[in-house]
Amino acid sequence: MDTESTYSGYSYYSSHSKKSHRQGERTRERHKSPRNKDGRGSEKSVTIQAPAGEPLLANDSARTGAEEVQDDNWGETTTAITGTSEHSISQEDIARISKDMEDSVGLDCKRYLGLTVASFLGLLVFLTPIAFILLPQILWREELKPCGAICEGLLISVSFKLLILLIGTWALFFRKQRADVPRVFVFRALLLVLIFLFVVSYWLFYGVRILDSRDQNYKDIVQYAVSLVDALLFIHYLAIVLLELRQLQPMFTLQVVRSTDGESRFYSLGHLSIQRAALVVLENYYKDFTIYNPNLLTASKFRAAKHMAGLKVYNVDGPSNNATGQSRAMIAAAARRRDSSHNELYYEEAEHERRVKKRRARLVVAVEEAFIHIQRLQAEEQQKSPGEVMDPREAAQAIFPSMARALQKYLRTTRQQHYHSMESILQHLAFCITNSMTPKAFLERYLSAGPTLQYDKDRWLSTQWRLISEEAVTNGLRDGIVFVLKCLDFSLVVNVKKIPFIVLSEEFIDPKSHKFVLRLQSETSV
């Protein structure tokens, strides 16, 4: 019978075989493969998550998956062990943490530097027309000609144009940053440079022709400020075209393939740089792709390792270092055993499907009974006073034990236990009770894997990405480009294809060609 060890303070289980005690100790040591928060294991370190997001079940991603069938009475053999080490760290973890800190510091500096430059330039743009109008009033007010009705109308026009420019600039440029990219946006940088040169040229002309000569025609000075504001508005229109409208027309089709399981999606994009296209791919990945589950890959790895471990090579000529000959012998033996391996795979998958269907049926029945109990409690609470009514959280805690065992076994069988903590299940159950959802609506999250956004962020296993491309990431997309988005456990391979040019011709059909004459004879029966 399988036994499990639970470390106090953390949800950590290790599976033991039903053989001798010594073999169980070896299995325990082998199964204590570390997992950090992002799901990456290391042979030299152990990283334990904080108990805030304690999973409902053990994180079996370090185990070899379905090597042994769990006994249904595992709950009666659970042993609590205390006094164990809670934290451990290796030199690899220290190096990785220091590298992440350096990268984060560099990204923060770059982000704040860009924001500072953009803010300074924006402040300069909005203060320049106001300074053009106020400086003559401050320096040579007595020498200026009086401002007539037309001049005052120009001042009102400048005020409203500056207000429109302020709102448009805030809406286009001062939006919350969605991601940190390795390079700057080329068009945005060009627009900032253009605005800077434009404002500097206006200041030079203003200093030479107006400040030095002390121009007395105040109307011309106001008209000069109006021309500056008009030019800034046109630059803002140009920014809208380059940054927003240019990318709306689809020009390329991107095929995104996940390297581990081959799941793929297709997206249509317009003229974008490689790094901006990567951002679009990642934003769609979190809502379109099912969450990455490394536990589903352990069964095939274990089967291949077991298949090769059963092969031994004997050298009848004596000891030698002929590694090439041994490798060839192993490959030949594996090829001879290949004929029977498909039967093993077939029966393993059939047995797994049988267990999944069995435990799914038990889970569905348990959840339906729990929701029937909730409906009965709600009918009873309608007759109680308002102070005695149970809230959805208390109702969820009341019925959860009746379905916990069936849900636990199903999640372990489908290897989803590390994505669902007990707290998240209770919150989802309380949400379903509050909105009067059916048992099927509650089970939909657990019966099939959903997109990444459906789960907590600490279960995503992919928060930091690296963009790998043979070309500069600021270059635009073109046909045949391949770039890779890599995280800790898997990567997304993106293949760019240009949408083909379609030739559509028109063929006119004369409406008279569809007409026909039905001639009836006297003998014809209609």
From Swiss-Prot:
Organism: Mus musculus (Mouse)
Topological domain spans for side Cytoplasmic: 1-114, 175-184, 246-526
Phosphoserine: modified positions: 88, 90
Keywords assigned by UniProt, alphabetized: Cell membrane, Membrane, Phosphoprotein, Transmembrane, Transmembrane helix
InterPro entries per UniProt: VANGL
Pfam families with a match to the protein in the record: Strabismus (PF06638)
Family to which the UniProt record says this protein belongs: Belongs to the Vang family.
Record flagged with keyword Transmembrane helix: yes
Gene for this chain: Vangl1
Subcellular location, record wording: Cell membrane
Protein name: Vang-like protein 1
Binding partners and assembly: Heterodimer with Vangl2. Interacts through its C-terminal region with the N-terminal half of DVL1, DVL2 and DVL3. The PDZ domain of DVL1, DVL2 and DVL3 is required for the interaction.
Recorded topology in the membrane: Multi-pass membrane protein
Low complexity bias locations: 1-15
Ranges annotated as biased composition (Polar residues): 75-87
Gene Ontology BP annotations: mucociliary clearance; pigmentation
Extracellular topology ranges: 136-153, 206-224
Residue ranges, annotated region (Disordered): 1-87
TM regions (residue ranges): 115-135, 154-174, 185-205, 225-245
GO cellular component terms attached to this protein's record: extracellular region; lateral plasma membrane; membrane
